[in-house]
Design a protein with these regions (language model features):
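Extracytosolic ligand-binding ectodomains
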Residues: 2-4, 12-15, 26-396
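N-terminal signal peptide c-region/cleavage motif recognized by signal peptidases
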Residues: 22-24
Length: 396
């Protein structure tokens, strides 16, 4: 029988070893990226686009040998646009799958709900679509939430600039959904207009699944607005267009990218001329990387005409997001959440959408966003297709 002191020593040593092993296991994550996006519901097009872009990047990375000698894989979850599901997915990706990072999807309400669990756990998050300003500029230090997508603060300035270019009387109306995304955009739009010495003549909100926007439309029309900015998804964007048609009001419409999915199908000819902010289009002159991604899209989906690609921005942003994460893992030298979070500030590369040099800046809270506003572009709905505005029938 061992002496008590010897037994106690061995138990203590075992405890230390187990503790060290647990720490090492916790630090060393798996070579997977968890994709928590909407692949069902009205924004399913967005999640499918993000999945496609991420898969193309992962295929390329793995064909070149993977990252730190390991092949990456994508683990897919559906948040269906529901914040509780997004939170649950985050915990599963981090604690059950032990992935190195989370990709975030379309809905800002989900991204806002993920802020707490992301930071409680300490897993890097890369937003690929949801544009709410405060989801990423969240005041956390260290901040584990990054984005390669649009940011509403910058989108508001972009859309306000476009609105004032085309307005004949400087009167702008704003239609926004009653969600974290829409409500978060209202102060951004007001601020962008105030910087130009203007203010909204109408700010009209609505809920998901509202069928008739006639009261809101009439108030905006009677306020004299000749341009309407939309912060809506396709479903409600369609209802606003139909209410405008019923009211006999035809303002110029400029929207955030929530109406970039199937508005042309839902609204038919009423969508013609509706302008939409995007971060990428496969219909412009393509770089070598763009041509390579187009070929991969055709191989995976059978789509040959770039005009038939839905949610091009989601595909392109997700593609670049995976490469930024892969670069950070290489710089970190390990599949370790904290090391990868720190390494993201050192990443610099020429991406599909834009050059990221550097991708992020730790000293500037605004630069948790990799994609700068000079790379935003304007597209327009025409005969059921979303095409570049420049050179379109509406570019007069």
């Amino acid at each position: 029988m061992l002496p008590e002191t010897s037994l106690r020593g061995r138990l203590l040593a075992a405890t230390v070893v187990l503790g060290l092993s647990a720490t090492g296991a916790f630090a060393q994550q798996e070579p997977c990226i968890g994709n928590s996006v909407a692949v069902t519901g009205p924004a399913a097009f967005s999640g499918l686009a993000i999945k496609l872009g991420a898969e193309i990047a992962i295929d390329e990375i793995n064909a070149a040998g993977g990252v730190l000698g390991k092949k990456l894989k994508l683990i897919q979850y559906d948040d269906a646009g529901a914040p509780p599901r997004g939170v649950d997915n985050t915990r599963r990706i981090a604690l059950a799958d032990k992935c190195i990072a989370v990709l975030g999807g379309f809905h800002s309400t989900v991204a806002l709900a993920q802020v707490d669990p992301i930071h409680e756990i300490g897993i890097p998050y890369m937003g690929v679509w949801a544009a709410n300003t405060k989801a990423i500029e969240n005041g956390r230090d260290p901040n584990f939430m990054f984005r390669i997508s649009a940011k509403d603060k910058w989108v508001a300035r972009f859309l306000v600039d476009e609105a004032l270019k085309v307005s004949k009387n400087g009167k702008i109306a704003f239609f926004y959904e009653n969600t974290g995304w829409g409500n978060g955009a209202l102060p951004d739009v007001k601020s962008a207009l105030a910087a130009k010495g203007k203010e909204l003549v109408a700010a009209e909100t609505f809920n998901w699944n509202d069928q008739d926007m006639t009261p809101q439309v009439i108030r905006a029309r009677d306020a004299g607005a000749d341009v309407a900015i939309f912060w809506a998804i396709d479903r409600e964007g369609n209802q606003i267009l139909r209410s405008m048609d019923k009211a006999g009001w035809k303002p110029t419409i400029i929207g955030a990218w929530g109406i970039s999915g199937n508005l042309g199908e839902l609204a038919g000819p009423l969508a013609n001329g509706v302008r939409v902010m995007q971060t990428y289009s496969f219909q412009t002159e393509q770089s070598a990387t763009g041509k390579k991604v187009l070929a991969a899209i055709e191989a995976k989906t059978g789509i040959k005409d770039p005009r038939d690609i839905k949610a091009a921005s989601g595909i392109a942003d997700a593609y670049d997001a995976v490469y930024l994460l892969a670069d950070a893992i290489k710089i970190a030298g390990a599949y370790d959440w904290k090391k990868v979070q720190a390494a993201l500030y050192q990443v610099s590369r020429d991406g599909l959408v834009a050059p990221y040099k550097p991708a992020f800046d730790k000293k500037d809270p605004e630069r948790q966003d990799a994609l700068l506003p000079q790379y935003y572009l304007l597209t327009v709905w025409h005969e059921g297709k979303l095409i570049p505005f420049k050179g379109s029938p509406y570019d007069k």
